[in-house]
Amino acid sequence: MTLSAFFLILFSAGLHATWNMIAKKERMSLAFYALLCSIGAFWSFGVRFFTPIGFFNMPAKFYLMTCGTLTGELFYGCGLVLAYRTLDMSTAYPMMRSLPLLFIPAITTSLGWGKPLSVQAYAGMAVIFAGCLVMPLKEISDFKPRNYLNRGMLFIILVAVGTTLYTTFDSQSQKVLREAYPEVSATMRSLSYYSFRALMLALIFWTIVACFRRTREEALGIWRRRSWMPFVAGCCSSLTYLSVLLAMNFVTNVAYVQAFRQLGLLIGMLEGFFILKEQCTLTKIIGITLILEGLAMTVL
C-alpha cells in the first residue's frame, strides 16, 4: 500500500468519525440527516451529465438490490438518530461500526455471496462480539443479561442491521453494474452509482420529513437557526466516500482499505472523550481494544 493510500484512508476515517461527532453534538434529527444526505446528492449530481450509465434501463435485479440498499439506509438513519439521543458516542460509535462485521458474513455466507470465511476470520468475529459486550458496561461486574435489554442496545442493533443491509446490497448492485457496463471504469461506475443512490436517499428522507409535523418543525428549526452543521456533516460524509474511492486506486488489495478504515473507531471514541467530554471508563478501553484486535484478525 502506498503512502498516498494510507493518508487518504486515514483522512476518510477521521471524516467519518467527525460527522458522527457533529451529529451527536447537534442532537441529530431526521431533518438533520435528510440535509446531510442532500449534500451528497448535490455534489454528485453533476456525474449524471457525463456518465454513460443509464439507470432507467437496468435489469430488474439492479432495482431490487437498490431497494434493499435504501431500506438499509432507512434503518441506519433512523437508528442513528435514536442511538445518539440515548448513548454516548464513545460507546455507540465503535459498536455500530463493528457489529456489521458479524452480521454481513452471516448473510453473505447463507446466500452464497462471496468467498467462504477462514477460521481466523471467525475467531476475529468472536473477539469483536466480546468487545461489543464489554463496551456498554460501567463495570465488568455489570455483565448480566438484563443490562443489555434496553433501548440503547436496540437502536445500535437497528443501525448495525441497516449497515449490513446497505453494504450487502450495495455490493450486489455494483456487481450488476459491472456485468451491464464492463467497458466503464470502476471509478466511474462507483461515482455513477453513488449519484443515483444519494439522490434516491435524499428524496426518501425528505418525503418522511414532509409527512410528519414534528419532523417538519425540526427542519424549520434548523432553517431558523441558520445552522451550518448539517452541511458541514454532509460534506464530511461525502468526502469520506470519495476518499475511499480514490484510495482504492493506490492499493494492491482492497482488504487494506477495509482494515485501515477501522482507525475511525478509535478516532470516534477519542472525539467522544475530548470534544464531547464523555466519561472514559475501563470497560470502554477494554472493549475498543478487543474490537480493534478482532477487526485485525478478520480483515488481514
Protein language model features and the residues they cover:
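Membrane-interface interhelical linkers
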Residues: 1-87, 130, 137-157, 161, ...
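Residue positions within transmembrane alpha-helices of multi-pass solute transporters
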Residues: 14, 18, 75, 99-106, ...
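Hydrophobic side-chain positions within alpha-helical transmembrane segments
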Residues: 18, 22, 79, 106-110, ...
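Specific alpha-helical transmembrane segments that line the substrate/conduction pathway
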Residues: 69-73, 81-129, 195, 199, ...
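Hydrophobic transmembrane alpha-helices of multi-pass small-molecule transport proteins
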Residues: 104-109, 118-139, 283-300
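Transmembrane helical elements of multi-pass membrane transporters/channels
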Residues: 159-171
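Alpha-helical transmembrane segments and their membrane-interface junctions
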Residues: 168-170, 239, 243-261
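C-terminal transmembrane helix pair
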Residues: 257, 264-278, 282-286, 292
